[in-house]
């Protein structure tokens, strides 16, 4: 496993990997389209501020399984050698459409859409959900604070309470997109 999760094929659920294995075994290689959208907003919330796209793009461009990832998957004794060889060569080759970061979105609107070979689209689902929903939540909260504070600037102080350095940077960036001064 590499030190960063950006681009790691292991940033997914085991369920997703078992689905990929089944697709590989059955030679399922069709194109699939997946959308990420919010069904409904909580009461007293009427908009979202989209964030997380830059991290998604970075992940998709760097996506791969390194030797450590494959060694770990091999140790699970759940996957065939042929499937693991397939993962070694797997790269994201699909298309991504997304609302630009900082845009306002409403319930029922797609925040992003992926069109790719089914195995690629399935693999990135967990990362997309985790990243876009988290960063959009932070950006939206920051926008609500900005609206409540009027013209007074506010800071996010994410490094003090975040769960690690990477999370602090992720929160600070999303808060800035939502209106934090720093």
Spans of model-derived segments:
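N-terminal, Lys/Arg-enriched amphipathic/low-complexity engagement segments
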Residues: 28-88, 97
